[in-house]
Amino acid sequence: MQDEVMTSGSAAYAYPLLIKQLLLTPFVQSQDEEIVYRDQFRMTYATLRERIARLANGLSQHGVRHGTTVAVMDWDSHRYLESYFAVPMMGAVLQTVNVRLSPAEIAYTINHAGAEVLLVHTDFLPVVESIKDKLETVRTFIWIDEPGSEVSEHSIPFATEYEAMLAASSTSYVFPDFDENTRATTFYTTGTTGLPKGVYFTHRQLVLHTITLMAALASPVSGQRFHRGDVYMPLTPMFHVHAWGMPYIATVMGVKQVYPGRYLPDRLARLVREEGVTFSHCVGTILHMLLACEEGKTTDMSKWKVIIGGGALPQGLAKAALDRGIDVFVGYGMSETCPVLSLAQLPPGAEKLDADEQLSLRCKTGRPVPLVDLRVVDDNMDELAHDGKATGEIVARAPWLTQGYLKNPEASEQLWAGGYLHTQDIASIDPTGNVQITDRLKDVIKSGGEWVSSLEVENLISRYEGVSEVAVIGIKDEKWGERPVALVVLKEGVAVTEEDIKQHVLSFSTSGKISKYAVPQTVKFVDAIAKTSVGKTNKKWLREQFA
């Protein structure tokens, strides 16, 4: 049977889902709303419109055409926001460079992406100076100067400076229509093994992620919401999965936006206070730093809503945030998923639950957002029961998931084996549809034939008074196969012993909450927990150091 395909009139407009369409509403309805960069720069949406056009004209003068890859090395700024729009709207590809990678890895990603133009903030001149002769495809360097940044000696052949280029360019640019499946962005995953892998997204995918997530965030009756009265500040780097796609959402909504530059805790806390920030997103490490810094201790955060992602939200950290009035909750996804798949928003009626139950819901992986087909499956790809007990791998489908890794067909096939994107996260789903990740496939511990969730043990230890941070890893054991080891960072001036931690975890074993195999064999007190370039706990490194 043949499908009856809709036919269009000869004059009908086949509306492509292009990033430029996201600007139609804010440029009319929010012309006078502010976009702020640190304490250095303020502009309106009307000015943003002009600067996007100026950037496109300037890049055109330097040879950027449809399909050209433009790489950016900058802190979170208004310039990055301009690049988010101008570059893909030209039909070019925006590469957001992870500036926390090693120089060799940065060179690899730029070469692998085939970037021809590189925008470089002053702070990264030493890095680019050290790799410029290894950049095989870059033909044009553009300098991003900034007041207060120290200019190091270099021999980089800059063609122009960013603001000078914009000043010399027209405020009029006609952004063309083209296929909505055109690649818009590229960035590189930062796994703990092998070379970084290129992930890419099309205009259609980014528009659908933006609209769907905007609807999901606006839907709660109260709390865990993002609405047009909010003031937005990203605390996830703009080089990392488009800062979770939130700058696109904030711009569509036309809200006041605040870009903090380099993440310095006291500066971030001051911006929250002085600019009235009410909505952000970050990894738990950043939230922990903000709560602990001097400015953070005296800043009223009672109007602040924060999504935590990039790893589990320990209940201890969540409680500390809630005690400060912060409306904190989990968002889940990964680089390959654009990234958001689920949100841990409280359902209607949750206000009747006791504090511990509400805390538990906020720390879950959450419920899938609209259009996401998320399943937990066994090794045969059979879906498991939604009973809150059966655990398997999370696999997903959604219209914004990357279709593969750039120039890596073998890894792409593995990613999409069986027609679903594989996350390598182990989880269960309860009868209400809430997902709860129990571990990463590579981090789960098998002791005495029993599976031990490192995340569950971390969560319990994080609730012990005096614990600042914790990571649990498995080490080899002749008798048990593996045994859990807890690495603990204590709060300043607190006296806690190894036996204190063990007895705390043992109490949950005695009550039947966890297996006795989950009680750490050893507790090591450390000064800090190693992190990856995007702020996640680096368990591979920890295993190498402590196993």
Model regions: which residues?
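AMP-binding/adenylate-forming catalytic core of the ANL superfamily
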Residues: 101, 107-108, 118-122, 272, ...
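Structural core segment of the AMP-binding/adenylate-forming
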Residues: 61-62, 89-164, 492-494
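Conserved AMP-binding/adenylate-forming core of the ANL superfamily
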Residues: 33-77, 81-85, 102-107, 163
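Conserved beta-loop-beta connector loops within the AMP-binding
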Residues: 368-395, 429-432, 494-498, 537-538
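Gly/Ser/Thr-rich phosphate-binding loop
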Residues: 252, 274-282, 291-360, 373, ...
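Conserved AMP-binding/adenylation subdomain of ANL enzymes
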Residues: 207-231, 239-278, 293
